């Protein structure tokens, strides 16, 4: 009989302390039950216990079961983190602190030398103070390398579940994957066609890319295309220009591919799949303009030559001087001796198509009104100036200034305008760094084996591709078709070299 008394006393206490709640018109019994339930612990194994456990894990920052598998094992997420390490935010770091190592443990850059975890949102300052003491510098680097694991929050999964090492390495032990990726890069680059950059013969000699090696690579690509399905071959129709094929083959060996992220914008952009560097080809001399110069070099006369037949109208006209043909500039300050011959009224030479799309002021300007005045030269460093042609006095001081601006703004005819497939990578990219052997990687080593010859990644890939082709090549194979075509292209390269030496 004591139970009803206790219940009445409890009700009186509730009404006294929570009078406002009890008198509320909405759900008075439900409010009382809610207050009672808040003071009672749920049974073990019940639904409430599971919800409470999940809530506490969420509050404490504990990862869910699917989170490590989505973040740490996703190759796309890995390289999205690598892409945040720009040259302005992450520079001057040793190889053990490369973006590939930082992204392995879930770090991204938010400011200069400032890292942030993509999961627990922890911050890590990775600045390296200038020090003349080499031991202190190495100690600081070792501390930062250790902090990549220890600077995370308590319940973060990255220290225990980093991304695989293979994400930041070239698959040298898997020739089939190398050949497949090599073909994919080649096909993507062929879509750029004549927008591919021109290659300097000296760079090809330095890379030891001979005609025979290029021929073997082209045969390998042809064989792999034959092995693809009929549907794949119909959707990947390639051009017939052998010069495009040779250039795309060399670029793909060095790890470059056509950037697909900006394909709807129709930009001539190539990217590296490892260091995520994107290069706009409008800053380099392209095959299209080089072919125009080469064709014009065999038909030079004393008078200006009109536009080539069969070429698009957007290509530049051919000037009357061989030196002007190579410089493709409106400013004759580099060669004062030829200035008098070029003061006569004539067609103004416009830039190539790539420059037309890169600067709003790169357009043909009116002819000079008198021999004492000339049109202001167009440079990339001018920005968006007055669209109308400005007439300025042809003073020696201004001519010298314009010459420096033209030469320092990646003109398409200077020595810097040729695309170097190896130097355009970032210094920590696996394509240009010395590759590690499989045993060295398993032992956690970072130094190359002294007994093995040190070679960059692209050269190791080239060796594997050539060995793969030679091992699968029959004893009697007619290799005259593509070999002869590649020799024709290299003759064109040598002709360019002779033109550049004029």
UniProtKB/Swiss-Prot annotation:
The gene is ZC3HC1. Required for proper positioning of a substantial amount of TPR at the nuclear basket (NB) through interaction with TPR. It comes from Pongo abelii. Keywords: Acetylation, Cell cycle, Cell division, Metal-binding, Mitosis, Nucleus, Phosphoprotein, Ubl conjugation pathway, Zinc, Zinc-finger. Residues 50-72, 351-360 have a biased composition (Polar residues). The modification Phosphoserine is found at residues 24, 58, 62, 321, 329, 338, 344, 354, 359, 370, 381, 395, 407, 483. Disulfide bonds: none annotated. GO terms for molecular function: zinc ion binding. One of its GO terms (cellular component) is nuclear envelope. InterPro entries: NuBaID_C, NuBaID_N. The lineage of its organism: Eukaryota, Metazoa, Chordata, Craniata, Vertebrata. Interacts with TPR; this interaction mediates ZC3HC1 nuclear envelopes (NE)-association but also required for proper positioning of a substantial amount of TPR at the nuclear basket (NB). A zinc finger (C3HC-type) spans 102-156. The modification N-acetylalanine is found at residue 2. A motif (Nuclear localization signal) lies at residues 396-402. This is Zinc finger C3HC-type protein 1. Residues 35-74, 302-423 are annotated as: Disordered. GO terms for biological process: cell division; protein ubiquitination. Residues 371-380, 407-422 have a biased composition (Low complexity). The keyword Lipid metabolism does not apply. It is found in: Nucleus; Nucleus envelope. Signal peptide: none annotated. The modification Phosphothreonine is found at residues 28, 84, 333, 384. Phosphorylated. May also be weakly phosphorylated on Tyr residues.
